[in-house]
């Protein structure tokens, strides 16, 4: 927590920072859109999107009406997307600081990473909670491949469950593999299976953020 954040939030706790990561096409932007729409009437939200060379995700969120345009900031990371959320998160930390100058009462800052691999993780300096998203269309074997995104994220999301019959994926196998990969000495780390086209599983993701992030409505 920086002194900047404390100085700008004398009456409230610093905003909860929620990092959303996952491979290209897994549904990160759709999840962020749905979370914003589900939570913006209760909480003061802002969002940072990461793309390598464009600000396409920022545009998509704006067009969808997820949040007002001024509450969404696109960051062009260049190079490897994981660098901007892990090894050198300065570009995102600067973006957050800029957004909090404009919206000092923000309750939640969402940070969507650029599409990356299973090894992607957020720096603790950048994110308080991490959500890692994969999609069923990538194959039922993905959960058992492991990697920090699957094993260490605070919440693991298996998205696009509706596609399972079309790609020959067994959701039961994916669930069992996920349980095996996310079981630690302290117990099972949470995961959710979602179909965001029908909002299936969305309420569980919102509840996780509210409970784990100890949010209080604005």
UniProtKB/Swiss-Prot annotation:
InterPro entries: CobW/HypB/UreG_nucleotide-bd, P-loop_NTPase, UreG. Keywords: Chaperone, Cytoplasm, GTP-binding, Nickel insertion, Nucleotide-binding. GTP binds at residues 22-29. The keyword GTP-binding applies. One of its GO terms (biological process) is urea catabolic process. It is found in: Cytoplasm. One of its GO terms (cellular component) is cytoplasm. Its main location: cytoplasm. Coiled coil: none annotated. GO terms for molecular function: GTP binding; GTPase activity; nickel cation binding. Facilitates the functional incorporation of the urease nickel metallocenter. This process requires GTP hydrolysis, probably effectuated by UreG. Belongs to the SIMIBI class G3E GTPase family. UreG subfamily. NCBIfam families: ureG. Homodimer. UreD, UreF and UreG form a complex that acts as a GTP-hydrolysis-dependent molecular chaperone, activating the urease apoprotein by helping to assemble the nickel containing metallocenter of UreC. The UreE protein probably delivers the nickel. This is Urease accessory protein UreG. It comes from Polaromonas naphthalenivorans (strain CJ2). The lineage of its organism: Bacteria, Pseudomonadati, Pseudomonadota, Betaproteobacteria, Burkholderiales.
């Amino acid at each position: 927590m920086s002194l900047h954040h404390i100085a700008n939030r004398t009456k409230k706790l610093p905003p909860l920072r929620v990092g959303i990561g996952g491979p290209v096409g897994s549904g990160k932007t759709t999840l962020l859109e749905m979370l914003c729409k589900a939570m913006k009437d209760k909480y003061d939200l802002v969002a940072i999107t990461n793309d390598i060379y464009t600000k396409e995700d920022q545009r998509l969120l704006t067009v969808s009406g997820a949040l007002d345009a001024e509450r969404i900031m696109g960051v062009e990371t260049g190079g490897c997307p994981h660098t901007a959320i892990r090894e050198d998160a300065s570009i995102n930390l600067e973006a957050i600081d800029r957004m909090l100058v404009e919206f000092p009462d923000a309750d939640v800052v969402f940070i969507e990473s650029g599409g990356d691999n299973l090894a992607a993780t957020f720096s603790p300096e950048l994110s308080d909670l991490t959500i890692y998203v994969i999609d069923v269309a990538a194959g039922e074997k993905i959960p058992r491949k492991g990697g920090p995104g699957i094993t260490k994220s605070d919440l693991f999301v298996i998205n696009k469950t509706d596609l399972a019959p079309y790609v020959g994926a067994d959701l039961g196998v994916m669930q069992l593999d996920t349980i095996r990969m996310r079981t630690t000495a302290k117990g099972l780390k949470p995961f959710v299976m979602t179909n965001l086209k029908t909002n299936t599983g969305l309420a569980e993701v919102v509840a996780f953020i509210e409970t784990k992030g100890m949010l209080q409505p604005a």
